[in-house]
A protein has these predicted regions:
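Substrate-binding cleft/loops of secretory-pathway carbohydrate-active enzymes
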Residues: 270-298, 341-348, 373-382
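Short hydrophobic beta-strand segments
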Residues: 1-17, 44-53, 73-74, 128-133
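Feature activates predominantly on carbohydrate-active enzymes
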Residues: 13-23, 27-29, 58-255, 259-265, ...
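Noncatalytic carbohydrate-binding groove/subsite architecture in carbohydrate-active enzymes
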Residues: 277-286, 290, 298-324
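Aromatic-rich surface patch/π-platform used for binding flat ligands and interfaces
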Residues: 55-59, 269, 354-358
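Catalytic domains of carbohydrate-active enzymes that cleave complex glycans
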Residues: 388-529
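Structured mid-domain segments that build the active-site/substrate or prosthetic-cofactor binding neighborhood
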Residues: 200-203, 211, 310-411, 417
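Short, well-ordered secondary-structure micro-motifs within conserved domains or adaptor modules
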Residues: 37-59, 67
């Protein structure tokens, strides 16, 4: 009835429990118009909302929620379990749905009542992250149980760290022997690798690592990982001997990491299995505190990783690492980096790939997607991935429909039809879906002229369905930008187009991109202008 009948009790307050109380009260107030008082203990005549008790039956970030007469309890298995439990309570039992940055729906009600129930849940992966502009909304990040690398990795050293730890600009001239030996000479440089058999380099790295951890007390993990670039690993006689014996350049890398892990047994060391180091060594096994960050950068995305040649090579590597390690971090790529504002229909493979990762001992996942506004259905991709990273056994099609109806309202049936048509056209074309694609690659397939006219008709109907709601209309128009951009890119390769009509289409794209804050077309920062 708009008056508090319960109080929030945190017996031993922590930062996470306090954040959970704030989250609960924020949405209780938005629903009912009032907040629940905080109390160090139960109050006579009031029900108690107990936050932060320990739950032994769930893992880190997991939670137990129990509701019985007079008491609602959200208990934690550690980490952010209390906060995530509160978000689940709000979503499942109080009618709040979060969709994207600052975008949520709820039903106002002066009276909030809960049934008796009990549930417990833990995440499939201990670390879950996406690139999404929505992550700038702290409530969104908590709601979708996302983390950030600087919360885990000391000094934010989490990928391609060789040159950050020992810059070639500092050590290259005085100690070229620290760097890769290729074609008869040492090659120090920003993208060179280390000579991993050099004992002096190892001791220097140990000193640097010790300094980094001392500068970041409380942090337990760091990445010691190759610089970006392929086939730049050291081929001096000693490194080459190890790699030939191990059957992969990962051999010398894992031996080096094992030595570090043994020197610092209370720390965890992550390293890349990427490009030349993707496949595991034949003999040496990573120590338990060596984390393998395995990257699927070379894989095509039109089908699950198990179903095409590029994916099967990655799966072979994944299964090989899984045989020797239970500590695998997957870096998965899920958007077109060369043309971010273009259709990328990979939604049908997300669940199967994440289930594959879980099956093969992955404990951490980073989904590199959606860094900018305007990328293909960025909000839906982030929503589905966050849900599936918590539990990869969910129905991906159901998640898609939930999002479309919640975020786009009456336009949802048309956008669902568009997604199914686009996906079907991709698969029927036999054209691979690549993270460095051009829409021109698909002009005879999923982006052919006939289909593009059909897509335009579908979006016209979607816009008309929400024409009286400026917020929903804006969301639909932003979702349409990838089709508009693709039409313009394809037109550049063709003769006979109506120049005046194309000029109008260019101006419409520019205007809508500016209206919705879409500024970047690819990861090289090429702008709309």
């Amino acid at each position: 009835d708009g008056r508090p009948k319960a109080c929030i009790v945190i017996e031993q307050p922590t930062a996470v429990d306090t954040a959970a109380a704030r989250m609960l009260n924020k949405f209780v107030e938005r629903i009912s118009g009032t907040t629940l008082p905080l109390s160090p203990g139960p109050r006579k005549g009031m029900a108690a909302v107990m936050l932060g008790r320990s739950a032994a039956t769930v893992g880190e970030d997991g939670y137990e929620i129990t509701c019985r007469p007079g008491e609602l309890s959200v208990s934690t298995g550690g980490g952010k379990g209390t906060l995530y439990g509160v978000c689940t309570l709000l979503e499942r039992y109080m009618g709040v749905d979060y969709w994207a940055k600052d975008a949520y729906t709820l039903m106002p009600n002066r009276t909030i009542t809960l049934p008796q129930f009990s549930l417990a849940d833990s995440p499939a992966f201990r670390f879950r992250q996406t690139f999404s502009y929505s992550n700038n909304d702290p409530d969104y990040e908590a709601w979708f149980r996302l983390e950030h690398q600087d919360q885990i990795f000391a000094g934010d050293l989490w990928v391609h760290t060789f040159n950050r730890i020992l810059p070639a600009s500092v050590y290259g001239k005085s100690h070229p022997e620290y760097y890769s030996f290729i074609n008869g000479q040492r090659r120090p440089g920003d993208h060179s690798q280390w000579c991993l058999s050099n004992p002096e380099l190892f001791e220097l790295v140990c000193h640097k690592v010790d300094s980094i951890f001392k500068a970041h007390p409380g942090m337990k993990m760091i990445s010691i990982s190759q610089n970006d670039g392929n086939n730049t690993y050291c081929q001096c006689p000693e490194c080459k001997k190890v790699d030939e014996y191990e059957g992969s350049p990962s051999g010398s890398l894992i031996r080096f990491l094992n030595k570090l892990a043994a020197r610092f047994p209370d720390k965890e060391f992550s390293t890349l299995a990427y490009l030349y180091s993707m496949h595991p060594p034949k003999h040496v096994k990573p120590l338990k505190n060596v984390n393998i960050m395995l990257c699927d950068i070379d894989c095509k995305r039109e089908v699950p990783l198990t179903d095409n040649a590029s994916g099967r090579d990655f799966v072979k590597a994944l299964e090989g690492w899984a045989r020797i390690s239970d500590n695998i971090f997957i870096w998965d790529y899920g958007i077109n980096f060369d043309n971010m504002v273009t259709p990328f229909p990979n939604f049908h493979i997300l669940q199967k790939n994440l289930a594959l990762f879980k099956k093969n001992h992955a404990t951490m996942v980073f989904e590199q997607v959606n860094g900018q506004r305007g990328t293909d259905f960025a909000e839906m991709r982030a929503y589905m991935l966050a849900k599936l990273m918590w539990n990869p056994d969910q129905d991906a099609d159901l998640l898609m429909r939930e999002f479309l109806y919640g975020y786009y309202g009456a336009a949802a049936p048309y956008l669902y039809k568009y997604q199914n048509l686009l996906q079907g056209a991709l698969l029927a074309s036999g054209t691979p879906l690549w993270i460095y694609d051009s829409p021109v690659s698909h002009k005879n397939g999923m982006l052919n002229h006939k289909l593009m006219r059909t897509y335009a008709e579908i979006f016209d109907k979607a816009e008309a369905a929400v024409g009286d709601d400026s917020t929903l209309l804006g969301r639909v128009q932003m979702a349409r930008l990838p089709i508009q951009y693709s039409e313009l890119e394809i037109a550049r390769t063709e003769n006979g187009n109506d120049r005046e009509a194309m000029a109008r289409k260019v101006e419409d794209f520019r205007m809508k991109a500016a209206r919705y804050g879409v500024t970047q077309l690819n990861e090289r920062n090429n702008t709309v202008e």
